[in-house]
């Protein structure tokens, strides 16, 4: 059967064109005008995009499925227009052996409704200085390496890890955090920490480890990717490293682009995340970094928690914010429609073809004949409200609930099959 998406504004190769999209046998067959098919999806007045790509999600499965599981996490991704995600390995048990990795990859495929690529850990159990067998993990299905949630504390361990990752052509995606400098902090070091009387987090906890790792990456030649950069100095370090030819890429998270420490209204656990919300100066540097290419992509760091884990104030709340279901609409509303900081084409690139390109996910994040029919359709014209009852994730820990947005997802397709449709649970 052939399905045609008619009369949409299609994002293709960095451009927006008025076109139809023809789907057959789970793939894009053609993009053009006056196309016909057995089934017609009317996209008049809608944006037709490649399925978005999020290289940074936490699905808590196995080990903490009361927070999220593969099924609900992938449903949340589809609700946000994402059809390809990278799942972090900070689950229980950590997939640090070939058998555990194979099981994770199999579970992702069986339970997920989107394409889920699985990270392996940089170190065994994410908390030791012992390296797993990277070659075996890659053979079992690991697409990259990360200890996200933990910084690699020992320089020698990271140096050895980068050498082995380079040998096995694996990306090292780092959560840059020096625990001795983080020092159990909660809020960015500044006036807000003083106002709330909460332990501060110095930006040095992030920047010193980035500086260290950039030197190690230069020495080893590994592809070093930095997760959720959040400070002006981090951006400056990456900019200098790229100018020196170091093989480094990095991502920014939607919440660090949209919010600052000044937006924390009170001691509210929904605003507790790691890295913390930073200053307006840091936020401005992130936006400049995206626009000048220093920051390569946007990734959500979708980190769901049970409701009770985010209550009782920031001191006791868990770190983390959800993002899969709110990323595109909140970023589009703020930076494209209202403030006109980005173009729609730029935003779509940072959320689709760029993350796919950085991580070597061939045929993801693009609409081209022969590619999988992974498609997202968005409504840019009508205002809606973000409501808890509409979330597909088990986690509702986002401060964006109640916000009026444009860019709600109308439909998401994976391999030509509808996996999300607005109005249907």
Curated annotation (Swiss-Prot):
Cofactor: how and how many bound: Binds 2 Zn(2+) ions per subunit.
Q: Which cofactor does it need?
A: Zn(2+)
Gene3D superfamilies, from UniProt?
Answer: Metal-dependent hydrolases
Residues that, per the record, bind Zn(2+) 1: 56, 58, 148, 301
Statement: the UniProt record of this protein carries the keyword rRNA-binding: no
Q: Which residues bind substrate?
A: 58-60, 90, 274, 305, 319-320
A single GO molecular-function term is: allantoinase activity
Q: Which reaction does it catalyse?
A: (S)-dihydroorotate + H2O = N-carbamoyl-L-aspartate + H(+)
One GO cellular component this record assigns the protein to is: cytoplasm
Active site: residue positions: 301
Q: What class of enzyme is it?
A: hydrolase
Q: Which residues form the signal peptide?
A: none
Know the name of this protein?
Answer: Dihydroorotase
Task: State the organism named in the record.
Answer: Lactobacillus helveticus (strain DPC 4571)
Q: Tell me the name of the encoding gene.
A: pyrC
């Amino acid at each position: 059967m052939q399905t045609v998406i008619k009369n949409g504004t299609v994002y293709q190769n960095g451009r927006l064109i008025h076109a139809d999209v023809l789907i057959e046998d789970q793939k894009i067959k053609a993009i053009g005008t006056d196309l016909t098919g057995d089934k017609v999806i009317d996209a008049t007045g809608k944006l037709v995009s490649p399925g978005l790509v999020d290289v940074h999600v936490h699905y808590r499965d196995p080990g903490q499925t009361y927070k999220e599981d593969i099924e609900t996490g992938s449903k949340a991704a589809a609700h946000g227009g994402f059809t390809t995600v990278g799942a972090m390995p900070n689950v229980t048990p950590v997939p640090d052996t070939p058998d555990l990795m194979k099981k994770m990859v199999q579970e992702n495929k069986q339970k997920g409704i989107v394409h889920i690529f699985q990270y392996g850990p940089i170190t065994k159990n994410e908390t030791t200085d012992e390296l797993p067998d990277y070659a075996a993990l890659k053979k079992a299905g690991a697409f990259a390496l990360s200890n996200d949630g933990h910084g690699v504390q020992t320089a020698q361990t990271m140096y050895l890890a980068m050498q082995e990752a380079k040998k096995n052509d694996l990306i090292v995606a780092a959560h840059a955090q020096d625990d001795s400098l983080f020092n159990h902090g909660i809020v960015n070091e500044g006036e807000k920490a003083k106002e709330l009387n909460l332990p501060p987090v110095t930006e040095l906890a992030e920047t010193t480890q980035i500086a260290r790792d950039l030197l190690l990456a230069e020495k080893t030649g590994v592809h070093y990717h930095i997760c959720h950069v959040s400070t002006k100095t981090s951006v400056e370090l990456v900019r200098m490293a790229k100018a020196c030819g170091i093989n480094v890429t990095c991502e920014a998270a939607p919440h660090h682009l949209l919010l600052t420490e000044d937006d924390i209204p009170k001691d509210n656990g929904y605003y507790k995340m790691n890295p913390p919300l930073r200053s307006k100066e840091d936020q401005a540097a992130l936006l400049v970094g995206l626009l000048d290419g220093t920051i390569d992509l946007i990734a959500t760091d979708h980190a769901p928690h049970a409701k009770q884990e985010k209550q009782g104030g920031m001191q006791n709340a868990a770190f983390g914010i959800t993002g899969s279901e709110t990323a595109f609409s909140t970023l589009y509303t703020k930076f494209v429609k209202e403030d006109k900081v980005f173009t729609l084409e730029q935003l779509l690139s940072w959320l689709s073809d760029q993350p796919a390109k950085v991580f070597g996910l061939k045929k993801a994040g693009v609409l081209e004949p022969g590619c999988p029919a992974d498609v997202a359709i968005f409504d840019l014209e009508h205002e809606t409200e973000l409501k808890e009852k509409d979330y597909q994730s088990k986690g509702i820990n986002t401060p964006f609930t109640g916000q009026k947005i444009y860019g709600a997802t109308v439909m998401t397709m994976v391999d030509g099959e509808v996996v999300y449709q607005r109005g249907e649970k």
